[in-house]
Amino acid sequence: MRNLTYWVKVPFINNYLLKILKYNREKIHNLFLKNTIYNDNCSLIDIGTTVDTNNSHNIILQKTQKNKNISCLSNQDIDSLKKKFPHIKDFYIGDGKKTDFDDNTYDIVYSSATLEHVGSFQNQINFINECTRISKYQIFITTPNRSCFIDFHTKLPFLHWLPKKIHRKILKLIGYKFYCLEENLNLLDKKSLIKIMKILNITNFKILEHKFLIFKSNLIIIIDKKIN
């Protein structure tokens, strides 16, 4: 199984950028704690767990080590994480758009920086729908904001504001053959997330716009099933 990486390394400043990423994600984790019912007794599944062991990734696993009811689902082989995160109850390999879990299996379904990597807009709809189906209470999903001036995957500014077909053609021309494929990168803006909510007939949700410095770098969608 081929493990994927969605982070373009930048010479000389890569470690600095990873520190910024970690800081940003820890701020988002604070929003998670503030806006959900999470406690150390909740059952939670992280969908889209990465095999990358750098501390800027898998923040949710780092911050929940007192909880013995945490599971992970990834399309990559994440067995290597068992040693680093011994508190994790279950590691699953599968497709977040279509899982084998029963309805309402987990108190909270969590997914960080995965939605933009599941492919087409229809795939993104299916992904959110599946997260909602297997959650009993809440869904917490983060994704980079296409409206931000820079794409943090490629580290290129403004280019992703072009129509997506043109954006992908340019990425291919300048050597970003991985990111030029919709199946690997399909950024969303707030309007797109609202459209997905309407398609899925989800009414009890809120979208937070997380800022890095003065820029709205990340979108966070929180769905509360107790009222839907």
PLM ranges: what are they?
Residues 29, 33, 57-62, 128-129, ...:
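Short amphipathic alpha-helical segments and helix-helix/interface helices
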Residues 14-15, 173-183:
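Short glycine/proline- and acidic residue-enriched helix-loop micro-motifs
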Residues 20-28, 53, 123, 185-192:
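Soluble or luminal CAZymes and related metallo-dependent hydrolases
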Residues 139-168:
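Conserved class I S-adenosyl-L-methionine
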Residues 181-201:
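Short alpha-helix
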Residues 42-148, 223-226:
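Conserved SAM-binding loop
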Residues 1-37:
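Class I SAM-dependent methyltransferase Rossmann-like catalytic core
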